[in-house]
Amino acid sequence: MMNKIHKNNRGVLIVISGPSGAGKGTICKALLEKHDDIFISVSATTRNPRVGEVDGVNYHFLTKEEFKQRIAEDDFLEHAEVYGNYYGTPKSSVEKMLDEGKNVILEIDIQGALKVKEKATDGVFIFILPPSMEELKQRIIKRGSETPESLMTRFKSAYKEINYVSKYNYAVVNDNVEDAVKKIEAILLAEKCRVDRLKENLLESKEDEMHEQLYD
């Protein structure tokens, strides 16, 4: 009897970036709420926990010595120092989740994403775009936390960031969160069906089938 092709159980690493105001956080939250096989990576940091933050949930809180030791052990997909504190994406915990069949989201900035791309070549890199720069402006203004000067700074930063879209595998325009989520779901499904992800399992199933034909 012919064996079934083994299911590809390894999860997919989904790296999501985009300019401030594009809606990255809202999209990631919607994906997490909708799918029980999608998880978000918990970053590590050396900063002190804020009120209500839980170690292992909001961040993995490390001492600077522990963080530097992990850097020496190459245990970060990416890391950076911001205002005297270190932040990074632990490689071992991401790999553990992927091996367990969990799809893992990294919502990180562009520089961090490009560093991850150097180490995680099988990751799926998605850039979230606003429908227009005018819409982006309105979204940022609605937050009510920007001065005219900081608003201009954000716009200049957004223009620069959008130039990096060609470094990503996919671009998703977020004119509607529900539609953007559907597009990412379609991307994830297509990535799961890629031959290079299934190749090892396909070969194993062929070997099992040949063994049955010869010895059964």
Swiss-Prot record:
EC number from the UniProt entry: 2.7.4.8
Binding-site positions, ATP: G18, P19, S20, G21, A22, G23, K24, G25
GO molecular function: ATP binding; guanylate kinase activity
Chief localization: cytoplasm
Annotated catalysed reactions: GMP + ATP = GDP + ADP
UniProt domain Guanylate kinase-like: residue ranges: 11-189
The keyword Chloroplast appears for this protein: no
Protein name: Guanylate kinase
InterPro entries, alphabetized: GK/Ca_channel_bsu, Guanylate_kin-like_dom, Guanylate_kinase, Guanylate_kinase_CS, P-loop_NTPase
Subcellular location as annotated: Cytoplasm
Superkingdom of origin organism: Bacteria
Cross-referenced HAMAP family: Guanylate_kinase
Enzyme class: transferase
UniProt organism field: Clostridium perfringens (strain SM101 / Type A)
Summary of the function given for this chain in its UniProt record: Essential for recycling GMP and indirectly, cGMP.
Keyword entries, A-Z: ATP-binding, Cytoplasm, Kinase, Nucleotide-binding, Transferase
Family according to the record: Belongs to the guanylate kinase family.
Pfam families recorded: Guanylate_kin
Keyword Transmembrane helix: no
GO CC terms in record: cytosol
